[in-house]
């Protein structure tokens, strides 16, 4: 049986004179990019440059909308009602769609950022509003969402293309959610351990949780990082390991 998987990373998170991440380098190793849309990070010039780099390197572009929280990098919880969430989506995804249009690039997907992502996974009213906003911009844009989450199931029910995402460097609970960053087992730091877990998720549809149980999981795309040279090496190790195991690493626009 042939196995395919996408590798995605959050990019375009610099702002003004401030630089975050090694975007040009990480684009050599991933197949999809989640581009910040100016609220938790990014700005119009960064968005423009990131879409251009993605086109040059053949990396699929996704919108990465977050809460309007530059100071907290979009990681702080906010009280957001459904009408606000829908408008946030239209505003940010629509902006990145315009940059993609200017380069003749297809906007492949949308992936929420930080607290927006985490809350939408477990809050149906917020998830519904997010999907309403996505469909209002373009119903053909895929929703890249936490594997097995409410928002994944609701997007499938609506007929929205769904990319179920897993994480190379994070631990999972028995419920299929990520172990909170403040708890033991939240992070997988050893590259070989991470690779073995990713291979299990991709080829067997299983993952071992922080309690030692094995649960089902769907791995359409694996999130990796490019914050520094160590993260780049980690990402390269995962990609090379997948290829050696016979897994085809490709985005959803380049699959045969």
Please annotate each region the language model reported.
Residues 16-22, 41-53, 121-128, 147-157:
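Active-site-adjacent beta->alpha loops and helix N-cap segments on the catalytic face
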Residues 24-28, 49-62, 101-103:
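Acidic (Asp/Glu)-rich catalytic clusters
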Residues 69-109:
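Glycine/small-residue-rich loop that forms an oxyanion/phosphate-binding "nest" at active or ligand-binding sites
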Residues 19, 23, 33-40, 71-86, ...:
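Glycine-rich tight-turn/loop motif centered on a GG-T
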Residues 148-206:
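Active-site rim beta-loop-alpha module in soluble metabolic enzymes
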